[in-house]
Amino acid sequence: MGYRRLGLRSDHRRAMLRNMVTSLIKEERITTTETRAKEVRSIAEKMVTLAKRGDLAARRQVSEYLFDEEAAKKLFNTVAARYKDRPGGYTRIVKVGFRRGDAAPMVILELV
């Protein structure tokens, strides 16, 4: 599907998304372009849902995707506990204007 490539090869795109999800979990807020934020959001929502499950298989799946073991620990111990009663919608996208240089629409992606 050409509309989800983000202008990158598949290996670069996957690495970028993994980096951004890891950063989102560690920092709880990142600034990026709108298109990238929408892609990261869907992955981050799935990671939080896996963490809420909390079993060993879920822990292994999350650890395999995230680059940082500290981020995985935070996801299971802090973030999953925060959203235990919430049935989805763990992230928020807030528009912040346009990037100087190429006028790309910029947003803040944050955990609610």
Swiss-Prot record:
Under SUPFAM superfamilies, the record lists:
Prokaryotic ribosomal protein L17
Query: Which Gene3D superfamilies does the entry mention?
Result: Ribosomal protein L17
Question: rRNA-binding: present as a keyword of the record?
Answer: no
- Per the record, GO CC terms? cytosolic large ribosomal subunit
The GO annotation for biological process reads:
translation
Keywords in alphabetical order, please.
Answer: Ribonucleoprotein, Ribosomal protein
Q: Name one GO molecular function term.
A: structural constituent of ribosome
Quick check: keyword Ribonucleoprotein in the entry? yes
Family to which this protein belongs: Belongs to the bacterial ribosomal protein bL17 family.
Q: Which PANTHER family match?
A: LARGE RIBOSOMAL SUBUNIT PROTEIN BL17M, RIBOSOMAL PROTEIN L17
Its quaternary structure?
Part of the 50S ribosomal subunit. Contacts protein L32.
Protein name as annotated: Large ribosomal subunit protein bL17
